[in-house]
Amino acid sequence: MKKQYMNYMKSCLLVVIACFVSMVGAAQGFSPAAMEQLKTKRLWSHSQNAAGMPFDDIQNYSNVILGYDLQDGNYCRPQEGQKEAIVGVSSEGFINLKNAYVWGAFNFAQKNLTDAGYNASIADPFRGMPYYVADQHLSKWRNQYYDLKFRAATPLLGNHWALGLEGNYVATLAAKQRDPRVDTRFYTLGLTPGITYKLNNSHKFGASFKYSSIKEDSRMSNVNSYVDQDYYILYGLGTAIKGIGSGVTSNYIGDRFGGALQYNFSMPSFNLLLEGSYDVKAETVQQSYTTPKKIAGVKDKTAHVSLTMIQEGKNYTNYMRTTYTNRNIDGIQYISQRDNSESQSGWVELYNNIRSTYKAQTASLNYALSRNRGNEYSWKAELNVNYTKQDDEYLMPNSVQNAENLSLGLGGKKNFVLGNSLNRRLLIDVHVAYNNNLGGEYVYGGSHADYPTVTELQQGLTNYYTCDYYRIGGSVTYSQQVRENRRMNLFAKVVFDRVNTSDYDYDGRTHLSISLGCNF
């Protein structure tokens, strides 16, 4: 209880800091299109180095958004809810204190899932941890997400150097509502110090180092103690050990280390930022707190490269961003022996080796052309290309799962002026996308091929990742100033998206979002 109380107090403190940053930055105001343009041009804010803030646009801004999201349809992964409803609030702000630059953000979301399956132990089964517990029963989940971030940086020291620090705290509380139930708490706390060097007005260099700690406490139980439940302890790609009862207690502990390098070339009408990063996460899972037994772990290595360019002319702005990510996860299993001697009571690790590998490559290209109008745009045309390749393997007995996809998206936005008084705007967005599956399969070579972890969980994931589908949607945003002499802009936004596919008896998925907010 004391530890949970301390975590709660830390959360409250960070909320106060984020809100303070937002309120102090309330001197400026932007329409939704102007806020979008401002964030797009702040290239260093999308990097992993807080020390780059002096090289971005340093005018103050803040926003607060209240939102409701609803997703419905069976085109989803087996662990996702066929229906998901989210209520959330977010706040973000940047302030120029002359002798320091400070940015803060806070996000809270309450997510209610309906008919989610094959997860009975962890808050996020897609975070790169293949070792968790699953069951067949579709269930409701009640999840809460807290995400707090801050960045602080010095102005240029000696006209060349700048120092910066980024911190973030993420907490997730998730509860499954049907036996076997789970109450799981996920936490991560990270710090990223950085430094930048300005060679001259055109060339800047940066370096940053990242560390974060990871913790998840998962406790399963049955409310109906008279009925034992079946569950499956997953080891990857359908391999599982079946259990019966009230489940297990799992303790996930991990650390992440990494670093990034940045190069920035800028001219009055052109800005380019190149960044390369590499990080390694090591995480293990233990069962039981009284006599901990190390079950498995992962070594997660991620390399990422991004190139962002923006060219601003008198009438038009060109924006391009391309990224490449290569992620490799080694799944490690442990063999332990119980030792009840007086000197060494508990489980003793005898051996460990890599039993599975998970490889993922993603590449993306985003291009946008916008027509300038003051600090916002009149219209914008967008092109998005995304490529993903997944190649997973359980080594012995051998099982494989792979998928390869290429998607193309087109979009257009028009920012209508409804009146110069009160800065009234109507922003309309229309977008379409098509995903072409280039191949994929799932071949299971282990024992118990009739387990639902094989026939329903992994096969369901393969079906999801090997679908051709198209997406069509759009949004409408109305905004205006509160008063003529105040630059606070209120806005209301409605988003609708529909994904359709005829593969594997899917009937698609619908997304509806409604939000209210204000920009300062």
Per-segment meaning from a language model:
Residues 89-95, 148-154, 191-197, 259-265, ...:
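Residues on the lipid-exposed face of transmembrane beta-strands in outer-membrane beta-barrel proteins
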Residues 30, 201, 508-520:
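Outer-membrane beta-barrel "beta-signal"
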Residues 239-383:
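Long, internal scaffold/assembly segments composed of regular secondary structure
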Residues 62-70, 104-110, 165-171, 207-213, ...:
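Transmembrane beta-barrel strands of outer-membrane/channel proteins
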Residues 58-62, 98-104, 159-163, 201-205, ...:
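Outer-envelope beta-barrel architecture signal
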Residues 74-80, 115-121, 174-182, 218-224, ...:
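Outer-membrane beta-barrel translocator domains and adjoining extracellular loop/strand segments
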Residues 23-116:
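N-terminal, post-signal peptide beta-strand-biased segments of exported outer-membrane/organellar beta-barrel
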